[in-house]
């Protein structure tokens, strides 16, 4: 894997509050190696470890993007919905930002069927055919389309399982993470002090509650993906 410089600096991370963990009572002992101190009842994350693993994750996604691999970003907490969508769109990745439907990846054939249905309905609507149906039928299909757009809108162009999945919150997206583990899909995961660092392939210790912290981590990963994509396009 290529090692590159990703301009990850500790001061910027401190300003974004990346180092603030959860209360000391609410922690996972497996996170001990990633914690540097306790302050006012809160665990403080060791930012040199964060920088190291974030840099490793950037190297991984850069190499994967350079080889034309597919990415999926998962983050469904209300506060990260827009952030996840904009990061994914910028890096031309697929994303899930509303709700992870159980079996979305482990039962891929069902997801694929839903995606075909979604694409067909979108095509029908764009062509104006839904307006020629009886009102009741049209209303039912429009409701169906709206539901599919909500839950599958971010993966509408997905034609197969992703090569790498980036998960914004381990606790919130546990089902998605377990499905990736089951299928052997490599994962990159933000982990706060109440998480299990052993579940993902690359765990990035960071505050997963503060928007500024999540934005910083996602921005670094997205920049690395974009650089890798540019390299892929130049060589093909």
From Swiss-Prot:
The keyword Calcium does not apply. The keyword Chloroplast applies. One of its GO terms (molecular function) is structural constituent of ribosome. Keywords: Chloroplast, Plastid, Ribonucleoprotein, Ribosomal protein. Disulfide bonds: none annotated. It is found in: Plastid, Chloroplast. GO terms for cellular component: chloroplast; mitochondrial small ribosomal subunit. GO terms for biological process: translation. Belongs to the universal ribosomal protein uS2 family. This is Small ribosomal subunit protein uS2c. It comes from Platanus occidentalis (Sycamore).
């Amino acid at each position: 894997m290529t090692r590159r410089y990703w301009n990850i600096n500790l001061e910027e991370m401190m300003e974004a509050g990346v180092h603030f963990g959860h209360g000391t009572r609410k922690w996972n002992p497996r996170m001990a190696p990633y914690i540097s101190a306790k302050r006012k009842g809160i665990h403080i994350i060791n930012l040199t470890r964060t920088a190291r693993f974030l840099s490793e994750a950037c190297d991984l996604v850069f190499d994967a993007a350079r080889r034309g691999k597919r990415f999926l970003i998962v983050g469904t907490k209300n506060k990260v919905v827009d952030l996840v969508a904009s990061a994914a769109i910028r890096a031309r990745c697929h994303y899930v930002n509303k709700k992870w439907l159980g079996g979305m990846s482990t039962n891929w054939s069902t997801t694929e069927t839903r995606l075909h249905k979604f694409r067909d309905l979108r095509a029908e609507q764009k062509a104006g055919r839904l307006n020629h149906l009886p009102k009741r039928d049209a209303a039912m299909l429009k409701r169906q389309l709206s539901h599919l757009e909500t839950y599958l809108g971010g993966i509408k162009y997905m034609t197969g399982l992703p090569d790498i999945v980036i998960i914004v919150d381990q606790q919130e997206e546990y089902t998605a993470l377990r499905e990736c583990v089951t299928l052997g899909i490599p994962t990159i995961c933000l982990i706060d002090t109440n998480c299990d660092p052993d579940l993902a392939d690359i765990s990035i210790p960071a505050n997963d509650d503060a928007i500024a912290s999540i934005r910083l981590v996602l921005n670094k990963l997205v920049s690395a993906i974009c650089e890798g994509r540019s390299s892929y396009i130049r060589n093909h």
